[in-house]
Amino acid sequence: MKLSLSPPPYADAPVVVLISGLGGSGSYWLPQLAVLEQEYQVICYDQRGTGNNPDTLEEDYSIAQMAAELHQALVAAGIERYAVVGHALGALVGMQLALDYPASLTVLVSVNGWLRINAHTRRCFQVREQLLHSGGAQAWVEAQPLFLYPADWMAARAPRLEAEDALALAHFQGKNNLLRRLNALKRADFSRHTDRIRCPVQIICASDDLLVPSACSSELHAALPDSQKMVMRYGGHACNVTDPETFNALLLNGLASLLHHREAACKELL
């Protein structure tokens, strides 16, 4: 699997891996790259079955497979320890990495994530699946911004959204791959495993997220033994895109704090 690695800003700089959501595209994190690359070696990628990592996914494709594929690609690239910033589905992959490769994951940042799919989120995806079946890729793509962005933000950026729609259609991952990735997301349930997630976790959510209620992040925070939660008042599901200034400040401060916390804890064990 192809990865995009930025040069480390200094020797032994911490590694931060960015994992996008259901769309799978590494370009989702463009508003974060410049600031992160000043402090970290940053890795982003198109998830298997999407973008520049095309493939036909198995019918029973799972979050565990997504985590294993990424970890194997990182090891092949010489990356043994890394922090993860995951958005929605990407946060689920991050939690799976924390369970399956605890020695490798230093810090996890969950952005609009959850323990198990919420009834409201499931309803949203049912509607979107119906659109996909009845109207194809174009209907899916045209409806997607409604679940990602605040209404006023969209209204002020109509030309941008039209361009994004055209790009998304041109690089659509395919109906079967999309549904298999979506089914993996819907089956994931970490509610009985949080006591095994030992790395420090930063939870960022947006109170106006239409797709994933912020209560999901509250449940995640309550269940994780070593977590802190930050709430953005505005931004929607894609809050890192709509309000990158606020998001980036939270992310940079959180990463610095948690990585320092992890390093101090490791020194105490020596």
UniProtKB/Swiss-Prot annotation:
Gene3D superfamilies: alpha/beta hydrolase. The keyword Phosphoprotein does not apply. Its EC number is 3.5.1.-. SUPFAM superfamilies: alpha/beta-Hydrolases. It holds the Pfam family Abhydrolase_1. Keywords: Hydrolase. GO terms for molecular function: hydrolase activity, acting on carbon-nitrogen (but not peptide) bonds, in linear amides. It comes from the Bacteria. One of its GO terms (biological process) is uracil catabolic process. Disulfide bonds: none annotated. It catalyses: carbamate + 2 H(+) = NH4(+) + CO2. NCBIfam families: RutD (TIGR03611). HAMAP family: RutD. Belongs to the AB hydrolase superfamily. Hydrolase RutD family. Involved in pyrimidine catabolism. May facilitate the hydrolysis of carbamate, a reaction that can also occur spontaneously. This is Putative carbamate hydrolase RutD.
